[in-house]
Every structure is written in structure tokens, then in C-alpha cells.
Amino acid sequence: MRVGIPTEIKNNENRVAATPAGVHELVRRGHEVLVEAGAGLGSRVSDDDFRRAGALVVDGPDEVWRESELVLKVKEPIEAEYPRMRRDQVLFTYLHLAASRPCTDALLAAGTTSIAYETVQLDDRRLPLLSPMSEVAGRLSITVGAYHLMSAVGGRGTLLGGVPGTPKAKVVVIGGGTAGEHAAANALGMGADVTIVDLSLPRLAQLENRFQGAIQTRASSAYEIAAQLADADLVIGSVLIPGAKAPKLVTDEMVATMKPGSVLVDIAIDQGGCFEGSRPTTHDDPVFPVHRSVYYCVANMPGAVPETSTRALTNATLPYALALADRGWRAALAADPALARGLSTHDGRVTNAAVAAAFDLPAVPVESLLG
């Protein structure tokens, strides 16, 4: 199969969909890999690195998209890429379609078979292709939150861990999944006072055990979230409903009660955000004010640490990319229920129930396409 890897063109998206090691494995199995010139530079991977791995490096995105049967990307296509998508092509990438009607409509109009990393789901409900980037985003959320708490950039001037004789910053993590767990771990490591809020009592018990009582946990409710926000310095929103838009758990009314210069980081912004006032921002212009607080809503946080993120992403996605290339998408999905759950669109139809519900569209059962 001919596999294409275009350069990511979303703002400050420096990741690339495969490392030279991943390309080498595809080539070793008899596939032809086309890589757009410069695609790996943001991840410290040169064109020569890809050539040595066996890739054909081509100038510009048009040839990559035109000649490839399987396109591997990192982020969802943006408007400039819509005309390049086509019906006889498989797109394997993060999509977050429930938060983007334009991208959904473009995929349906093109008839592209799209498979979303973030909805590939194992029988135990784990999300193997989302988890590594959730780990990165969770850890980064504390790094960027701590930075924006500095008074020089508009924050309240609080050091997360304080120093002897001063109070620690209070960090509230809403959502105790992978991103929330890693945010809590990083905040705790920096000496902060950490509270995790989640709906699942069994998950809260797991987190208390994992952190050996060093964090506080609270059962989620609107009342509890409002109470926690009232004296929080840094709030991390890490709520996830696989494939669906994130629920708005933090209202503007709650934010109005927060300390001046407090910071809110919305990791869920890829899925529409879990704060009422959230809107996507970029690494170039990452924050905006809401009442007296600072919102950070960058939709591709792991793109800021591409050398780490690209390696972690390829480690997770490569086995599935190999299956798609080796067997073709129908056979690969028929053989692997986890991969089948990632199918989002095919031949102008939506196949993910959460995406269909978000836009009041009919959903075609994946099973009906694999028989």
C-alpha cells in the first residue's frame, strides 16, 4: 500500500505522524511511504532521516495526498486540506469531529474513510491512542498553568509549591482520567495542594490509592465544583466522553467567584471544552481573560513538545497503521474491534454514534460495513 505523511499545518503543530523507525517498519513490510519535505523538522527529524528509513520525500502536500491510499496525520484536517481528501482514501489521525462540524462536513463531502485515533477503544474501555497524548497534555497543563500564574504574564503571582512559611497553591483537577491523573502527579511533584473531582467513586478510590493519600478527592457535582473553584489558584479541565463533545461543567458564574489572576487550563478544548467560556486558542496567542481569571485553551498542547510527543504517538499508533496497510481497512477493522470503534466516516456517512448525535445526523453501524 502507498502510505502518505503530510506536514502538519495547524498553528504550531510540530509533531509528525511517524518517526523514521515507524517508516522503516512500513517499508520493511513492502509498503511505499511518501513523506512531505520538511514534515519532521519540528520534531527534529530531517528529510535525510526519512530517506534513510526508506521513505520517498516529495515536495509539497499535493503529491502526498494525491498518491496515497492511506494518509497518516496527527491533527484533524483544516480548511486548506479539505480539497485534498478523496473517496478512495483512508485517513488515520486525531479528528475530534464532535467539536467540528466543518471538518465533519468536509469528510462526508469527500467520501473519505476516516479513522479517529481518539475513539479507538479496547474492550476494557481504555483508549490506547489517546492515552499517550493525554499523558503529555496532563503534564503540560501544570507547566503552562504555573507559568501563567506569574504576575508578569497576568497571573496572581503564586508559586505552586510555595516556600517554607507560605501557603501552597491550590490546584483543582476536574476529571480523573489519564490527563487528570498526570496533571495531578505533576502538580503534586511541584508541591501544590491538589484536589481531583470526578463522578466515578471507584476511580477516586484508585487515585487516592495511587497517590497514597497525598491528594484530596471529591465526588463531582455542580455544587462541589463551585465550592472548589472559589479558592482555587489553578484549575485543570480534563473531562472526556469518548467521541462526544465535552460537557460544560464550569460556568461563567462559577468563574466570577474565583480569585483575581487565577488560571484555568482546558485540556478538553479539542472536544469543545469543559468550561462555559472556553474557545480554542493557539500557541501563538494562548490565553484570554474571563472575568478576573486567565483561560488557556490551546487545542494542540502536545505540539509544543514534539520530540517527545511524536515518539510517544508513533509507539502507540504504529501497530494499527501496520494493520491498515497490511490488510486494508475493512479486514483490519473486522479483525480488531478496538480499531473498528475508531471508524468515524465512510462513503459520505457518519459511523460514530457520538458524532452523529452531536450534529443530529444518522449513524451507520460499523458492523454493516464490514460484512
For each of these PLM feature ranges, what is it?
Residues 2, 8, 77-169, 298-300:
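Glycine/serine-rich phosphate-binding loop and adjoining beta1-alpha1 elements at the start
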Residues 2-110:
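An N-terminal-biased, well-structured beta-alpha scaffold segment characteristic
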Residues 6-45, 154-237, 287:
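Glycine-rich phosphate/diphosphate-binding loop of Rossmann-like nucleotide-binding domains
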Residues 33, 57, 91, 114-115, ...:
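Hydrophobic beta-strand scaffold residues
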Residues 69, 75-76, 95-96, 221, ...:
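Short glycine-/small-residue-rich Rossmann-like dinucleotide-binding loops
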Residues 118-159, 269, 274-371:
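Adenosine-phosphate binding glycine-rich loop
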Residues 209-292:
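Rossmann-like adenosine-cofactor binding region
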